[in-house]
Amino acid sequence: TLLCTKLFFNEVNAVDKYEYKSKTERMLELMESGAYSRAAAIADEIDWRRVRNAVMLSNVSEIYEKTGEYQKGYDILTLAYQRAEGSRKIISRLCGLALKTGNVDEAIDFYDEFMQIAPKDPNQYILRYKILRAQRAPIEQQIEALEEYKKSEYIEEWAYELAKLYQEAGMTSECLEECDDLILWFSEGQYVYKAMELKMQYKPLTPSQQEKYDKRYARTSEETEEIPDIFSYAEADESEQEEEENGLPGAELMAA
């Protein structure tokens, strides 16, 4: 009887693993193609508490975040956090999702933890800015956070955000200077065109800027964004996951 019971559970586990593999492969395919709602529908069918792979859990959390299901995304990412304690990537995302679910105090806790783990990581300033924004802190403090980030990293999204903050604060000359810097450094792309439109609220574009702006639709229609290889990412070498995410070794699907 004991042998029969063991064989039965082995068969059940084999079916579970097959269904899990089949569903997650399809889910990641849909995620890769941008069909997040359909990917989320598959994710709803899986008991993620039994999954130990922190990378897979992070992907699922991102799917829910893309569909606006922030609480689900937060809950799944909390599981990833438990599987990979000390991961700055997961802690950073948890901070952002905590804000999206209205939990500012939790976001501050994750920010403090991020600072302990990675005190020199410039992304601390982005987290700080998001928290200050959620708290409706004085605009000067928000500007200071993004100015500090700019000293270490210059990313289109946050450069444009800084330009908008300058506009909000009535700092028109700083706003225009930031727009010109963004346009000069990155030349094209959605944030460059947004910066051009922001600048045009106050003064005309230069001839070269205007030429780029006039050709923006033709250029963007020709561009094809490279899609990340989610499958390779999800099947990352275990040792690399241990190093970067402090993931747990062993089978991805936990025993029931």
Question: What name fits each language-model region?
Answer:
Residues 210-256:
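Intrinsically disordered, low-complexity acidic segments enriched in Asp/Glu and Pro
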Residues 58-65, 78-79, 89-154:
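Alpha-helical adaptor scaffolds
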